[in-house]
């Protein structure tokens, strides 16, 4: 085990919409009755059970990765439950960690609740040659634009497909990732893309395939309407990618002036920025040259761990 860390399995129902909820209920019960000093909840939904270990005298920390009740994939009942988790965290948590300044402002303005800003971190990766991706998808270095993430509406993938279809380029668009209780939406995306053979859906990727996709892209795009702290954006920059992101604060505050930014939800602006990037290799290379050093220094995992442990011990 890494520094004494052990994994403990809990009971859960592997059913759509119930897996996370039942896991958090089981985990909270185990934490309440176990010999633990600190219980750390992640995401708003699981925080609905934070009161239980708190009732048993545990120090409780909540990390809010994003405002999950705003995500389009959730119905009214699920959104209500997630909102209950948010309010439980506000009322019961000893400390709340947020991953973006936007979410920090939300908690201050909505509840008057102070939070601690501790973003995600990233490590510098090993860059792999395009071997598996060439074999499976016919991809070469710098001949594709990459989106990598869950296929959910708020990620803006529909904008990206619509914009890319109007771009004059031989480069491909690779949509990498699986659905997240959103199979119908994933099918809609594939229907949108079916008349453009430049668009490739890889499905869920991990390991060497993931590394090769990150390490050989011409551009990485994250056109989201809503984010918490986009770890995929940190990872993409750590691989030395030129990134093209929407101007929401959660993306813009990460990239600062080290990436290309377009107006959120604006397909025409996204198309224009894509076309400019495809036509201007020197501009793209400039962003590539700066990305990895910038992001690995700004978001260092050792610093993240140190600050989190300080909250545990407070």
Regions found by a protein language model. Give the residues of each.
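Short His-centered aromatic/hydrophobic patch
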Residues: 41-46
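A conserved mid-protein helix/loop that constitutes part of the nucleotide-sugar donor-binding site
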Residues: 143, 147, 152-166, 187
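Aromatic "clamp/platform" in nucleotide-sugar-dependent glycosyltransferases that forms part
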Residues: 225
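Short alpha-helical donor nucleotide-sugar binding micro-motif in glycosyltransferases
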Residues: 204-205, 212-217
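Conserved acidic donor-binding segment of nucleotide-sugar-dependent glycosyltransferases
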Residues: 260-268, 276-282
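Nucleotide-activated donor-binding/catalytic signature segment of Leloir-type glycosyltransferases, i.e.
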Residues: 186-205
